[in-house]
Amino acid sequence: MRSKFDEQLKKLNEEMMHMGSMIEESIQKAIEAFIHQDADSAKAIMEGDSEIDREQKKIESLCFNLLMQQQPVARDLRTISAAMKMVTDMERIGDHAADISEMTILMSSDKPYRVNIEHVKSMASETMLMLIRAIEAYVEKNNDKAHIVMKQDDVVDELFDKVKAELIDFIREHPEDGEQAEDLLMVAKY
């Protein structure tokens, strides 16, 4: 009985890693589409969001089956509960990639970016690292990695503050490009 449960937990971990890879790819492609103002790629990312939603449902179903059929002990129950919480957050990150893509489509008809997008690119890189490390921390049950992810969130917050400050200055200096700056702030917020 326990070996079947362990197999299902292993399957859960594999599905979590798979979903993480899907989201990482979605974020990466969304940022690339944004950088290059590529509306066609952005549309494809938005269409691909439903695959992430299906993966979330698959993982939630697996968690419910583990809870109902296996009656896990405390440690295993925490693992399953953590997976259910994480998968919801992961799906939301996937939604943010779709939101960035939506903004890319809106901004793709604009003139080339006059605002600095380097901090947004850095935020995306940090976010992808956080996602990878969070999944690793979950799978490995590694509290130290989880704490690193929490600290990394502060780095992303600092980058967002820099983006905000730069955009405020940019709008003051170039009010004619204020809308583009506002749109970039929305992208950074996602």
Enumerate the predicted regions with their spans:
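Cytosolic, long alpha-helical scaffolding segments
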Residues: 1-190
